Amino acid sequence: DYSAGLKTVMNLSENDNLEISYGFDQYDKARYVNDERTHDHDYTNRQNTVRALYSHIFGKNTLTVGADFLNDYLTTYQFEDNESKNQNSCDAFAQFDYNPLQWLNIVASLRHDYFSASSQHATTGRLALMTKWKGFSIRANYAGGFRAPTLKEMYMNFDMADMQMIYGNPDLKPEKSNNYNLALEHTGRVKNAGFFTGQYSLTLMGY
């Protein structure tokens, strides 16, 4: 297994920050019998990842934009004819952390994903709100989700310990989801209760 990475963080100004990173990971597997490689269990998975993240602070608010790129290469005896597969996925996103009042915080974000092994693209969003007032807090959140299938899920065909065969599905589509969450929390103190004093917290959550 080989892995390496590079990362740079640049403070462009008092309110501007840029972060760029690169990651490399390669996992190789082979089988040897009597010190000779059989080539019937060769496996190589190689991933290259690039990420850029920029943030700008103005007042109590923060704007963050970024992008990711992943190149995934896999060759394995569990593919038909020991062939290799390759795919690219990338995304771009923006997030705004807004604090208009001392007791109110709003976070809104938008993200677009591209997946080379499918004609489907996806744009997902997130909106979160939190407010606090006299020991009470309310949190409301919506988030859209996206997950692209892996090369293993699409193309691997292998025998599971002679019990069953597992077949990949090359027509597998990306997963999409919508998540909603609402929570009410109350914190307080117990005073002058005889032998008992302390703090308490009550949370009611739905999703």
Task: Indicate residue ranges for each PLM-predicted region.
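Outer-membrane beta-barrel signature, preferentially recognizing the C-terminal barrel domain
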Residues: 1-3, 7-11, 118, 132-133, ...
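Face-selective signature of the C-terminal outer-membrane beta-barrel domain
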Residues: 2-121, 128-132, 198-205
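A broad, low-specificity signal for short, low-complexity segments enriched in glycine/proline
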Residues: 89, 143-144
